[in-house]
Structure formats: C-alpha cells, structure tokens
C-alpha cells in the first residue's frame, strides 16, 4: 500500500472505473490529475469535494506522464490504455491498467477502512470478486477493530517511547495471539490492554 499523501497520480479516463480509482487515491491523500476526452458526473462531483483532484477534458498525450509516480490507464479504449502503459513503463513509473492487469506493474485493491485498519483485496484481475470479498470482510472488521487497533497503537507508542520496548513485546504477544479477534468482538481488548499501560 502506498502512503497517498506523498503520491502524485495520473488517471487517464473519465468514467466510473476512473472515478472509483480516483476516490480511493484521494481518500488516501494523493494528488490526482485526470485526463479524459469526456469526464463523467462522478469525476466532476469528486473534483468538487476534493481540491487535490484536477481534471482536463482532452485527449491523452505522452507528456501527460510528467512527474506522476503512479499512472492508471482506465479508459474504455484498449489502444489508449496500452499506449498509456507503454509511456509509463518507458518513464519507469508504476502503472495500473484497468482492462489488462498483466500489462501493468502494480494492482489496485478493493479497500476497506475502519480507522487505521486497512484491508486491501485483489482477486487475480477480477475486481467484482475483490469487491464481494471486501464487503464480506467489512461486515466483520468494523469499528470494534478500529478501536482495538487504536488502543494497541497507543499502548505501543506509550511503552516504546517510555523505553519499555521489551514490555511492548510481551504485551503484543499476549494481546495479539490466537484470541485477538475474540477479544475484539467480545469488547475486552481495551480493558486487557490497560493492564499493560
């Protein structure tokens, strides 16, 4: 997974797939430039909500790669997607190709977020399967897990910053064992973690 706030991304395409990929990058904090002959309503709405999204309605040019670290080819034209991928490879950039994942050198994930817990799913180039799996996992890994992760992160910081890294090692071994999910789902993680802090 990428730390979005440090990423400048280029998306070529303006439809639903491009909008979905843009949304994920924007939520992660990336700066996104989108080029498309025609930009759909979803992209326009995203641009209104996220100042880090800039779009241009025009044809793609090889020079659009520019300083982008991540390039996403998301048009409904295989030829354009192939050209975008070739240009990105020539510029030594990470590239994702929506209609031909093997042509790219990275994949995007169907992502579920609950606080600082982030679960990313890929499914061999079958995005609808990844989405179905993500939705199934999201039903279980909810705000209870977000709270547990926040509690553990706070405990870890407190112990390590206080010079007690050995104590953190023992605490994490005790709290993040085979009963971790059981503790979270029964609501006992916070009280058990408090015994270590």
Placement of each model-derived feature along the sequence:
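An accessory alpha-helical subdomain
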Residues: 124-197
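Short beta-strand and adjoining strand-loop segment in the mid-core
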Residues: 29-33, 68-78, 116-125, 139
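Glycine-rich, highly charged phosphate/nucleotide-binding loops
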Residues: 47-66
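ADP-ribose/adenylate-binding Rossmann-like module
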Residues: 70-76, 81-107
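Hydrophobic, well-ordered beta-alpha structural blocks that scaffold small-molecule cofactor pockets
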Residues: 1-38, 43-46
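Hydrophobic beta-strand scaffold residues
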Residues: 32, 55, 94-95
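Short loop/edge segments at beta-strand edges and connector loops
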Residues: 36, 55-59, 99
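Alpha-helix C-terminal capping/helix-to-coil transition sites in glycosyltransferase folds
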Residues: 6, 66-68
